[in-house]
Every structure is written in C-alpha cells, then in structure tokens.
Swiss-Prot record:
<dbReference type="InterPro" id="IPR000456">
    <property type="entry name" value="Ribosomal_bL17"/>
</dbReference>
<protein>
    <recommendedName>
        <fullName>Large ribosomal subunit protein bL17m</fullName>
    </recommendedName>
</protein>
<comment type="similarity">
    <text>Belongs to the bacterial ribosomal protein bL17 family.</text>
</comment>
<dbReference type="InterPro" id="IPR047859">
    <property type="entry name" value="Ribosomal_bL17_CS"/>
</dbReference>
<comment type="subunit">
    <text>Component of the mitochondrial large ribosomal subunit (mt-LSU). Mature yeast 74S mitochondrial ribosomes consist of a small (37S) and a large (54S) subunit. The 37S small subunit contains a 15S ribosomal RNA (15S mt-rRNA) and at least 32 different proteins. The 54S large subunit contains a 21S rRNA (21S mt-rRNA) and at least 45 different proteins.</text>
</comment>
<dbReference type="GO" id="GO:0003735">
    <property type="term" value="F:structural constituent of ribosome"/>
</dbReference>
<keyword id="KW-0496">Mitochondrion</keyword>
<dbReference type="GO" id="GO:0005739">
    <property type="term" value="C:mitochondrion"/>
</dbReference>
<dbReference type="InterPro" id="IPR036373">
    <property type="entry name" value="Ribosomal_bL17_sf"/>
</dbReference>
<feature type="compositionally biased region" description="Basic and acidic residues">
    <location>
        <begin position="173"/>
        <end position="200"/>
    </location>
</feature>
<dbReference type="GO" id="GO:0005762">
    <property type="term" value="C:mitochondrial large ribosomal subunit"/>
</dbReference>
<dbReference type="Pfam" id="PF01196">
    <property type="entry name" value="Ribosomal_L17"/>
</dbReference>
<comment type="function">
    <text>Component of the mitochondrial ribosome (mitoribosome), a dedicated translation machinery responsible for the synthesis of mitochondrial genome-encoded proteins, including at least some of the essential transmembrane subunits of the mitochondrial respiratory chain. The mitoribosomes are attached to the mitochondrial inner membrane and translation products are cotranslationally integrated into the membrane.</text>
</comment>
<keyword id="KW-0689">Ribosomal protein</keyword>
<keyword id="KW-0687">Ribonucleoprotein</keyword>
<feature type="region of interest" description="Disordered">
    <location>
        <begin position="173"/>
        <end position="207"/>
    </location>
</feature>
<dbReference type="GO" id="GO:0032543">
    <property type="term" value="P:mitochondrial translation"/>
</dbReference>
Length: 207
C-alpha cells in the first residue's frame, strides 16, 4: 500500500528539516524576498503563511505568540518585525501573504529555482513589473492587455497608499521608455542605410 506524502522531506532528518525551514523563514522576514530551490521555497511558503496567521491571532489569552517564537531564529528582531510591520500590513487579508515565482534552473546542477516574497512589500516583483509594463505601454501608446489590467487590480487591492506609489513608478518607466525611443530614433537618423524598415531581405546572388 502506497503512503501519502503530505510534505517534502527535503532529504533531511526531522530536526534538520525544521531548522532549515526556520532559517528560511527568518531570512524571508528579514529581507522580505529570498531565492532558493523550488522544493524548499514551497515548504518555506507554508511555514511563513502559518507564522503570519499565528501572529495575527495572538492575544494574551492564548499561546500563539509562544508558538510563533518556535518558528523563527533571532526572535527579538524577527518577531518585532512580524508584529510591528507584517501583521498591520496584512490585517485586511485572510490568507495569501506570500508569493512564489519561478526562476530559471540553477546553472550548476539544473535544479528548479524560485523566489519567495511577501506581497505588498517593498520588494514585490509583480507590483514593480506591472508598473513597468503600464509605463512602457503608455509610452508606446499601446492598449493594456486584459492580463495587465487584472494584475493592476491585484497589486493595488490590499496595498496601502499603493495607487500613489504605482503612479510614481509608472511615470518613471514612461519617461525612461520615452528616452529610449528617442535615442533609437536619433540612431536611425544618424546611421546611413540603403534600406528602410520593412524592406525584404535581399537574397545572395549565388542562389
């Protein structure tokens, strides 16, 4: 009879696995974004979600804060940030405090890699990439795709003061794209070419 595997063992003993996850979550709280293998990131994501949920439900009548202390290292600094920064940030969210994105495989052993981050934070990749996409589309006078509009709604739904920060990033990317387009246009004018964009590629004479 096959056994159901409810979690990844990560090739370690129980104590070593627990210490690894505590270390990953501590680094995640400290830096708000970490890169590791996909399997470790998936397990650390579950650990981090439990930590935030436990911190949100902590009160003097229960032992949730004591349980949260056992999930991280450097308790004084880590838990201070959890309760002072992360819990107020996610008061409006019931779940989904982290996001896991795929990265190219590691060059040395081709291991699947990923980046684990807290959403609505200063290192939110989707927030910055969506703002960059909108800025480029506005500079090139292109319509926003349905996926981009959906991402705008997602990244601004729970983010405090997100609209002002998003508009600032969009304007910055728009100006950067305008400068790039202007530079490309100047290069096309200065370089002498006996062909123009859209002309068919000439075939070699020996064919």
């Amino acid at each position: 009879m096959t056994k159901t595997l409810y979690y990844r063992k990560l090739g370690r003993t129980s104590a070593h696995r627990q210490a690894l996850l505590r270390n990953l979550v501590t680094s995640l709280v400290k830096h708000e974004s970490i890169q590791t293998t996909w399997a470790k990131a998936k397990e650390a994501q579950r650990f981090a979600e439990k930590l935030i949920t436990m911190a949100k439900r902590a009160n003097p009548q229960n032992n949730r804060k004591g349980l949260a202390e056992g999930m991280v290292f450097e308790k004084e600094t880590t838990l201070k940030k959890v309760f002072d920064v992360l819990v107020p940030r996610y008061n409006g969210r019931r779940c989904g405090y982290t996001r896991l994105l795929k990265l190219p495989p590691r060059s040395t052993d081709n291991a699947p890699m990923g980046v684990l981050e807290f959403v609505d934070g200063p290192k939110d990749i989707r927030f910055h990439m969506t703002a960059k996409t909108v800025g480029i589309c506005l500079a090139q006078q292109k319509a926003l795709t349905p996926i981009t509009r959906k991402n705008i709604h997602k990244v601004l739904l729970f983010r405090k003061n997100g609209k002002a920060e998003f508009d600032q990033l969009v304007q910055k990317e728009k100006e950067s794209e305008h400068a790039r387009l202007k530079e490309d246009h100047e290069d096309e004018k200065t370089v002498k070419k006996d062909w123009k964009r859209g002309d068919p590629i000439p075939r070699p004479t020996y064919i």
